[in-house]
Amino acid sequence: MNINYFVRIVPVAVVLLVGISGASMAMSLKLPNPAELSGQWRLSLQGKADDACELQLNTEAPQLTGDVACAAKWLHEPPAGWFPTPDGLALTDNQGNRLIHLNRMDEQTYEARLPGGELLILGRFAD
């Protein structure tokens, strides 16, 4: 085989592989509809459920209600809004800036590691 053949075919193969893997990753992460996540949630540190904050995720303004002052002790300011992401959800300040991103663990649980190492858990209220 000619070396020119390899020089031409390798870049094409790399582009195809990168495109395929990127497309499959994009298909595996679905952006949830905000209505799927709206409702009552509890925010707490792992192992400290008695110190939990009750939050209400709404699809209309005000987007986030409940005990936002309680949540501020971990977020350093009260959250005012939220939005879904393909791999979780984000809590935002009143300007729409992201305060924290919580990773989706399952349909009822989202988690984030705080700078001090504590695990912050957002869990859906059981009806």
Curated annotation (Swiss-Prot):
It is found in: Periplasm. Keywords: Disulfide bond, Metalloenzyme inhibitor, Metalloprotease inhibitor, Periplasm, Protease inhibitor, Signal. Disulfide bonds join 53-70. SUPFAM superfamilies: beta-Barrel protease inhibitors. Gene3D superfamilies: 2.40.128.10. GO terms for molecular function: metalloendopeptidase inhibitor activity. One of its GO terms (cellular component) is periplasmic space. InterPro entries: Inh, Inh/Omp19, Protease_inh_b-brl_dom. Pfam families: Inh. Residues 1-26 form the signal peptide. Inhibitor of the alkaline protease. Belongs to the protease inhibitor I38 family. This is Alkaline proteinase inhibitor. The gene is inh.
